[in-house]
Amino acid sequence: MLTFSPITESNAALFSQYYGICDYRLSDYSIGIKLMWNDMLASEYAIYAGCLIVRNKVRGRYAFDYPIPVTPDADIDAAFSAMADFCSENFIAFEFSGIPKKYAGEILLRFPNTETRRYRNLGDYLYLASDFADFKGKKYSGQRNHVRKFYAKYPDAIFRAFDEKDTDKLKAFREKVEAAFDKHSYGAKNEMERAWRMLKFVGSPMFRCAGFELNGEIISFCLSEKCGDTLIDHIEKALPEYEGIYPAMVQSFAQMFAWDVTYINREDDAGDSGLRTSKTQYHPVQIEEKYHFRIKNELYYIEKIPLIKTDRLLLNAIEETDIPAYNRLCLDDERNRWWGYDYRQDCAEPDEEYFYADQKKDFGSSTAMNFAVRLDEEMIGEVIL
């Protein structure tokens, strides 16, 4: 059975190595995303059959990433089986999130009874690194013009790598960016705050950090991470008063750091129309779709617990009026020891509605269906499917 442990700053270097060899080309498969959004994703991992298995919280429920082979003898089939067994044994929904399009078929082949969704707002923008380094051709004429204007207006601007010695300058840069920030949506503010959390990693070998400096002050900042053949740009920030600074930063960063990759991933647009326009204008070679899968079982198609009658007994849904009888049943240690489950493992001191609410949750997630067994309309037992 899988045993999961949290992904944290203390073990981040290990996952930087794993994601460094991952060829999925999605930002979801990077230590930067796991750290920036850790309080929301609550990412956990297990190593099984030579594969890195990661699960994250998505809309309040855990969903798996696509497994990553990390040893030469990795067995992805065994990893999938272990994930399925883990969900079955723990009565939780079996879901995947952030699955690359090229592996969507693998999920469907293994689990044909599947609900599939994808979200345009979450698609990552993928560009050729060589396009950004050169800005060649008619399609990049606008970017070239902005870059020329930037250097003509600010000839003393220097693009350079940042390290831990730049902490104070980056703090001053942060204050200026926040003072000029004019977006009021929760999503934009949330992304900004999470971006600043990554400043502590400037100088870390896990990331590539650089930006423009002018007259001793930092005026732009970019933080990226190499994952396989792709450079994933986690953060791009600049002071807006410097005309042309964004295309100049994009090009300079590619020239400095994209020498060993084929692609640059600038992540999603989160549905922001301004970001969508901007990222589209840089001519992505692909918008990498991400798929969410929920593996269905027979219970998925049952909307209501059915009524079953025998000559003597009646089986139907457990009702709120059954709570006293149901609690007596669930708290009967002498009987319950025979089926190997101790509720104290999940809740040491359950309140009056704990067991009733728990079985409703299991049915709602299609993991179990609990029947009350009734004799003369009185609940005398339980059957679980």
Kindly give the residue locations of the regions a language model identified.
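GNAT-family acyltransferases
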Residues: 164-176, 180, 298-385
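Conserved active-site alpha-helix within GNAT-family acetyltransferase domains
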Residues: 103-116, 145, 270-287
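Aromatic (often tryptophan-rich) hydrophobic motifs at membrane interfaces
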Residues: 207-294
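Acyltransferase donor/substrate-recognition loop-hinge adjacent to the catalytic core
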Residues: 111-183
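Conserved catalytic-core motifs of GNAT/GCN5-like acyltransferases
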Residues: 117-125, 285-299
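Conserved donor-binding loop and adjoining core beta-sheet/short helix segment
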Residues: 17, 28-102, 213-242, 385
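Short, conserved active-site entrance elements at the starts or edges of catalytic domains
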Residues: 165, 169-217
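A short helix-loop-beta-strand connector motif used in the catalytic cores of GNAT acetyltransferases and
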Residues: 24, 31-51, 200-210, 356-372, ...
